[in-house]
């Protein structure tokens, strides 16, 4: 009766499972063990180690080095060239108040402006250029040791979500309120520029105004890094031939009025010759210096006596 209570598949079986049977040595294996040396016997009994699959990470390329922007192969000219059409620039009169967002110094030929604020630039011509004429704006570094570097925004401002849908994030100069603006990257020089069609002045006006924005501070690390820049404005025909050129220095800062006053005072103290202001500018140049020196105050002389006469007294 107890035998019948056991399960049909006996737990104890004289037949070993196939995996265990493979681990046991047969009589032939034992004979070969003694016939061969111990080193060969160990090689026979040891199962070959399975080859580990090659990890996918090993096929990845080495990390790329930090990006270094290429140097430009050429430096645009910054010399003033009115051309046959008398091309020149002008700026709206603005003072040095603390609240001003954009101000131009004729004595320095320098524009001081805040980040991303409107900077009106007037275009003056003596005669109307041909149809298809374009106006190009490009920034370059002023000092000779930096001229071959391309002016671009700092990495922080490149990542800012302030795009107007037209300008690439690395471009410093933008045109405000003009959907026909084209932002170009030169394949040969790697320089950035923005081009707009030239529009003749409206009725009753003598100049055309383009509103520019500067999208990075002059002090930004990784960008201009306190290096002075120039903005070159060129007048070109439809084929890209030069019709006129003018330029001015730009400083993008938090307080344009204060910085303009400071630089003009330093300029007068140095006594440097005053550059000619643009013919279209409505702001007069500041005097470069004066020969008169402040008169010292006269000190009262001790030991003098004065007589005071009073009328109406007995």
Swiss-Prot record:
Residues 261-273 have a biased composition (Basic and acidic residues). There is a cross-link at residue 269 (Glycyl lysine isopeptide (Lys-Gly) (interchain with G-Cter in ubiquitin)). Its cofactor is Zn(2+). Zn(2+) binds at residues 154, 157, 216, 220. Residues 234-272 are annotated as: Interaction with E4F1. One of its GO terms (cellular component) is endoplasmic reticulum. Residues 251-258 are annotated as: Interaction with DNA. The keyword Endoplasmic reticulum applies. It is found in: Cytoplasm; Nucleus; Nucleus, PML body; Endoplasmic reticulum. Gene3D superfamilies: 2.60.40.720, 6.10.50.20, p53-like tetramerisation domain. Residues 80-270 bind DNA. Residues 44-88 are annotated as: Interaction with WWOX. Residues 91-214 are annotated as: Required for interaction with FBXO42. Multifunctional transcription factor that induces cell cycle arrest, DNA repair or apoptosis upon binding to its target DNA sequence. Acts as a tumor suppressor in many tumor types; induces growth arrest or apoptosis depending on the physiological circumstances and cell type. Negatively regulates cell division by controlling expression of a set of genes required for this process. One of the activated genes is an inhibitor of cyclin-dependent kinases. Apoptosis induction seems to be mediated either by stimulation of BAX and FAS antigen expression, or by repression of Bcl-2 expression. This is Cellular tumor antigen p53. It comes from Otospermophilus beecheyi (California ground squirrel). The lineage of its organism: Eukaryota, Metazoa, Chordata, Craniata, Vertebrata.
